[in-house]
Amino acid sequence: ATFSTPLTVPDDGDACNAASVETPFQSLVNQTQVLFNGLLNLKVRPSLRSVNGTDIVIGAVPMIVGTEGATWKALAYAGSTYTPAGLANSTWYYLYARIATGSIAISHSTTSPDSYLRTMNGNTDYVFLGSFRTDGSGVIYPFFSRDGETMYAASVAILAFSSAPPTVATDVSLAGGVPPYSQKAYLNLIGHPDTGVAEGMNVKTKGVTAAGISPVALSFTVNDKNDSGANLTWIQTDTSQTIQYYFDVGGGASRFALHVRGYSE
């Protein structure tokens, strides 16, 4: 559809025929379709936060756009506190809003959003608001989310202090702290070298092989064995939620810990 201007319509006394009526009305329909397409691509997300492990506070937004049956609708949302029930342990959940009979209902599901992160995959009645994860006891990880970026109130441990970390790139999954649709993870890296010589601890996005990129990994210097180094960094993630890590030198007394502090779409 095209956004054509100006619109010329029949005036009093003008002949009304296919040429004078169809053309301006087709242009008007085209403009309406353009505006509708733009509305569908406008993702208005509310702020989300959970601090007590059971409730999610959802902020207000000027409109939620989704279908009710086969009809597209837009409705303002004043915000609310939602308490999801029946949460399983160590599971990703997705929060949705649904327009029904003039009001908005909130629900959660293990069904992920579509590739546009706009509605539930395969069901446009459910508008995607964000995601959350439970720990090993079914408690919601405390988090704050806005504009597609989520930060945890406490870091999610992915790799505890491990002895003798590898000196070659080794896979580690971020699935415990990063949802499948995420593009970036915010990491807290803690390193402790074996010897008294400073060395590098490294993380990298798996699969980056482009020629001319040197170094491929993000490298952070950790000092002598009496001093641990801690660093915060963003890193790109692939759809498998897997990155790689290693030490330059390593050794039996070396330590490496990796925590997720947040993620971004």
Segments and roles (model prediction):
Residues 1-37:
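Extracellular "spike/adhesin" assembly and maturation modules
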Residues 30-31, 96-112, 133-135, 187-197, ...:
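Short, flexible beta-strand-to-coil junctions
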Residues 223-239:
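Beta-sandwich interaction modules
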Residues 62-64, 87-99, 144-218, 257-265:
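Beta-rich globular "head" domains
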Residues 73, 77-85, 101-141, 210-227:
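Acidic, glycine/polar-enriched metal-coordinating patches/loops
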Residues 37-113, 197-198:
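Glycine-rich, compositionally biased intrinsically disordered regions
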Residues 30, 34-57, 111-169:
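Glycine-rich, low-complexity segments
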Residues 125-139, 185, 234-252:
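Noncatalytic modules at the cell exterior or secretory-pathway interfaces
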